[in-house]
């Protein structure tokens, strides 16, 4: 069985992962069939690049992504696009669905960032109040 998974490269304390198609029996950093992309979690924001055509090919022939690889691929909408192709939708329908998915995803990410900013602001205010009352 072929798995789409992460292969760790990089140096100590600075991981970089290659997204690879590998036999399920191979070791984590062992033999693989093809490099499909790269994930750099230490960069801010995290950097994710991959070859869309080859990833779609491996998904179409039955390669199973691991949980972590699936989560990374899901962020880009590739799994949703593959699902629509399997269901037999036309390229036009897929294009419009992907546009609406992208808008929903962008708004979801923006809400998350706004929520973080509000939490930071409240924390600073609470610390300032605490300092005032203690001082």
Swiss-Prot record:
A family per Pfam: Ribosomal_S16
One term under GO cellular component: small ribosomal subunit
Highest taxon in the source lineage: Bacteria
GO annotation (BP), single: translation
Region (Disordered): 94-135
Gene Ontology molecular function: structural constituent of ribosome
Keyword flag Transit peptide: no
Alphabetized Gene3D superfamilies for the sequence: 3.30.1320.10
UniProt biased composition (Basic and acidic residues): 105-116, 124-135
Keywords assigned: Ribonucleoprotein, Ribosomal protein
Family note: Belongs to the bacterial ribosomal protein bS16 family.
Protein's recorded name: Small ribosomal subunit protein bS16
Organism: Chloroherpeton thalassium (strain ATCC 35110 / GB-78)
Lineage: Bacteria, Pseudomonadati, Chlorobiota, Chlorobiia, Chlorobiales
Gene that encodes it: rpsP
């Amino acid at each position: 069985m072929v798995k789409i998974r992460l292969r760790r490269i990089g140096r100590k304390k600075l991981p970089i992962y290659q997204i690879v198609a590998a036999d399920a029996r191979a070791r984590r950093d062992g033999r693989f069939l093809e490099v499909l992309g790269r994930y750099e979690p230490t960069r801010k924001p995290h950097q994710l690049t991959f070859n869309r055509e080859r990833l779609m090919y491996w998904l179409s022939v039955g390669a199973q992504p691991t949980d972590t690889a699936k989560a990374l691929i899901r962020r880009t909408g590739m799994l949703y696009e593959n699902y629509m192709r399997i269901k037999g939708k036309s390229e036009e329908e897929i294009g419009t669905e992907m546009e609406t998915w992208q808008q929903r995803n962008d708004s979801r990410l923006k809400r998350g960032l706004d929520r973080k900013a509000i939490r930071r602001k409240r924390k600073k205010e609470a610390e300032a109040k605490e300092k005032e009352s203690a001082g």
